[in-house]
């Protein structure tokens, strides 16, 4: 891996200077294809209702689930619509879940004069023992009970349930299944190590000195300005950098200025202006050395709803001079040397975390692969564009690397699908708080963290000893 390559030439750091300095050519990318076109918005019309996206999602997912149900329960299983159900008759039904949650925030409930309720305080999770599941298809809906984990599932999930209707009018679930992983193309063999660096949550404009130091150290390592010959040789094997959202800190979101009088704000500038200038300088250093893909995130200056559109190039007058800088969507998918990457800046995973009992971000990533949908909670609890022809968040093809940004900590694992698909899941930690990035080796699909937090830890130790400022 990366650190092993660097260790082979560690002795050069303390060696006497030589007449000729070693140079290392950046490993070239043989093939690259940006496959994010489904997430690009052409015509932007918000006049449509969101019912269309649920109907389209069910229509697109139904063939996958019928096929999966027949594999799971046998080819003789009867797949029916809700309007065709008979009491006591065992069958399979495909539909979209709605999760009725008493703790789910509702603006209508909060502003209702009739109830006169105090606004509900924010929670880390909104699950409750009284939550109920309702299955909907094109015509009807029915409540579910039985062997199904209510707390784990979320609204918008399309699944197949097996059971029968009871006398109380509810559907007794005996078993259920998801569409599971989509088909996957094989990974071509690579003869050398090639790394893709995943970074998220730079948090520029937050005022943290350690975060800025770590960011500059990261840039210096990638561009070969730091370390001995071994580390510089290893850095030359980084073929691409992907920045996965939240490039700006949440402190730059100066929403209070909207409520202030004009004369109080006319001579001030938004906190994000200086942060964007800093980002432009960082991207300039990176893109002068390596291809960089920049995804927007929750706190970045672009549209809030998914799919987020690329940041506008006019914000980066310095970095956009290089063709190696690419401003992309969130979600983002691309094929790099035959390896298909798909990732988000983390909003989809964070939203599922709030409305489900799942605690681990890698578990949520795997679950979205199993249900074959990137963001099932959109548009219910996560804003998204009102699509009506197709749902672009459905997995048409299984990626080889699936990542989400801005997680509390680093994590990675490989999962397998029913048709021998292999997917590397990566939880990319928030860099501003962890000072950690991720290196994905395209040869072998392995992942390791690379941390820049040592300087901050040493400073804390000095302060504990009374030697610091």
Curated annotation (Swiss-Prot):
CDD domains: MPP_PolD2_C. It is found in: Nucleus. Keywords: Acetylation, DNA damage, DNA excision, DNA repair, DNA replication, Nucleus, Phosphoprotein. One of its GO terms (biological process) is DNA strand elongation involved in DNA replication. The modification N-acetylmethionine is found at residue 1. The modification Phosphoserine is found at residues 15, 257. It comes from the Eukaryota. One of its GO terms (cellular component) is delta DNA polymerase complex. Belongs to the DNA polymerase delta/II small subunit family. This is DNA polymerase delta subunit 2. It comes from Rattus norvegicus.
């Amino acid at each position: 891996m990366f650190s092993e390559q660097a260790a082979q030439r560690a002795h050069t750091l303390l060696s006497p200077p030589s007449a000729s300095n070693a140079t290392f050519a950046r490993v070239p990318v043989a093939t690259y294809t940006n496959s994010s076109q489904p997430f690009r918005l052409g015509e932007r019309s918000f006049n449509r209702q969101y019912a269309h996206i649920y109907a389209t999602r069910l229509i697109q997912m139904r063939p996958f689930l019928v096929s999966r149900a027949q594999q799971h329960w046998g080819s003789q299983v009867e797949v029916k619509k809700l309007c065709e159900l008979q009491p006591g008759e065992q069958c399979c039904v495909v539909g979209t879940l709605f999760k009725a949650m008493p703790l789910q925030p509702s603006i209508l409930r909060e502003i209702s004069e009739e109830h006169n309720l105090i606004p509900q305080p924010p929670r880390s999770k909104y699950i409750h023992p009284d939550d109920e599941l309702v299955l909907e298809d094109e015509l009807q809906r029915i409540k579910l009970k039985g062997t199904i984990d209510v707390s784990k599932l979320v609204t918008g999930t399309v699944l197949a349930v097996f059971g029968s209707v009871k006398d109380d009018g509810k559907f007794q679930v005996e078993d259920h299944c998801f569409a599971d992983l989509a088909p996957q193309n094989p990974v071509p063999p690579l003869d050398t190590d090639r790394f893709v660096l995943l970074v998220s949550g730079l948090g520029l404009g937050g005022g943290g000195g350690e975060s800025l130091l770590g960011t500059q150290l990261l840039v210096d390592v990638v561009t070969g300005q730091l370390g001995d010959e071994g580390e510089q040789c290893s850095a030359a094997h980084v073929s691409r950098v992907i920045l996965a959202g939240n490039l700006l800190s949440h402190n730059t979101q100066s929403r209070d200025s909207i409520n202030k009088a004009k004369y109080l704000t006319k001579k001030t500038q938004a906190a994000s202006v200086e942060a964007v200038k800093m980002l432009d300088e960082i991207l300039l250093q990176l893109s002068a050395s390596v291809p960089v893909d920049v995804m927007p995130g929750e706190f970045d200056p672009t549209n809030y709803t998914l799919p987020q559109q690329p940041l506008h190039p006019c914000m980066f007058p310095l970095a956009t001079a290089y063709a190696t800088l690419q401003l992309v969507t969130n979600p983002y998918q691309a094929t790099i040397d035959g390896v298909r990457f798909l990732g988000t800046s983390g909003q989809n995973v964070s939203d599922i975390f709030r409305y489900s009992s799942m605690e681990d971000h890698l578990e949520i990533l795997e679950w979205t692969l199993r249900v074959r949908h990137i963001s099932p909670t959109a548009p219910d609890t996560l804003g998204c564009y009102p699509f009506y022809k197709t749902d672009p968040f459905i997995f048409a093809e299984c990626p080889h690397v699936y990542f989400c940004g801005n997680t509390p900590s680093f994590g990675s694992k490989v999962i397998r699908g029913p048709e021998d698909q292999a997917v590397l899941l990566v939880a990319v930690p928030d860099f501003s708080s962890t000072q950690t990035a991720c290196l994905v080796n395209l040869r072998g699909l392995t992942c390791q963290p690379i941390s820049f937090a040592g300087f901050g830890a040493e400073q804390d130790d000095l302060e504990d000893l009374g030697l610091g400022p």
